[in-house]
Amino acid sequence: MSDRPGVDPITLEVVKNALASTADEMALVIMRSAYSPVVRDTMDYSTALCDRNGRVVAQGLTLAVQLGTFPTLMRYVLEEYSVSAKPGDVYIANDPYGCGGQHLPDIYVIKPIFVAGELEGYAATMAHHSDVGGIAPGSIAVHATEIYQEGLRIPLSKLVDGGVENETLFRLLASNTRQPVHVLGDLRAQLAACRVGERGLTTLLERYGPDAHLYLDELQRVAERMMRAELALLPDGVHAFTDYIDGVGDDPEPIPISVRVEISGDEVLIDFEGTSPQVEASVNCPVGMVYAACYCAIRGIVRGEIPNCEGYMVPIRIDAPAGTVVNPVLPAACGARGVIGYRVYDAIMGALAPLVPDRVLAAGEGGPTLIAWGGYQRGYDDERIPFGTTEVLVGT
């Protein structure tokens, strides 16, 4: 697996599996602790561990098409907080346009991990929350024309500062949702998962001491090398495909998602030139999820036990033109971005089908079906108490 001097391949495998087990344990904590069905039952959430440079080193076995979103967000975390981070801090974000988020219900909670006073890594979680405000229960209205109609935008902020919770931010979140008990409960499940990730990574770093980062770096190198080796086995060439989703509005025209997959040596370029401009509806897909769908597609068609870390993403280059449905710009609505995100995956499968027909997935239903409903029930003294729920049906 590794040919680097000073790196013991058995220890490398132990480190890799320890990291993966910790990321999976984080995922189980969320599943067991979450309040809302969309997290607890649908498992619409993700977990990851990152090294001190913010690179993903392990991912929980949760929602595959979302796992590749962490690198986009972590770049913003490093830019904003890498110098000022301190023990006990926890960050929160959901903004697609300010910090690499996806759509507003997907809230990220990130905890920097310190060992002996030094920043050594991060525990990262994302969960689809049942409601963050906006014009429709569940915060996903396909007829929304701009993001300001979809709910609360959370810029990258401190949810916990040096171990002290930001009560103002907790109250702000509770005041902008129809489901405060579910949202705050799921948020605390994410906090608990981050603490589990912190414990697991700390134990690993203390066990191996200064050599630990040698092995974390080597995992990235091995993943990149193995991905390049797999891509090099494929013949050079360009493969194109265009898929469509139904349009929206009174006189809808089909919305094309055009993809060109170019394999050159040990790299691949995925180009979305020709894809529809962004639309005045909530199906626009922020680029973070588009990247994740691309990584997921390529990761799925290659062979070999490639470490599930950020290194395998390096040979995969992506060009998604700004202002399109695969890279919208403010103020485009994006609540139903999964419709495009999953179709991006399908389009890549369509492009690669003639090349590796035995490895691509057959086309699914083309995207997730999300059902959200809500209303009000009478409480004491005729108080109007909101209720609601969100369910996601995905067969892909």
Locate predicted features.
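Glycine/proline-enriched, intrinsically flexible loops and inter-domain linkers
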Residues: 1-87, 92-269, 273-396
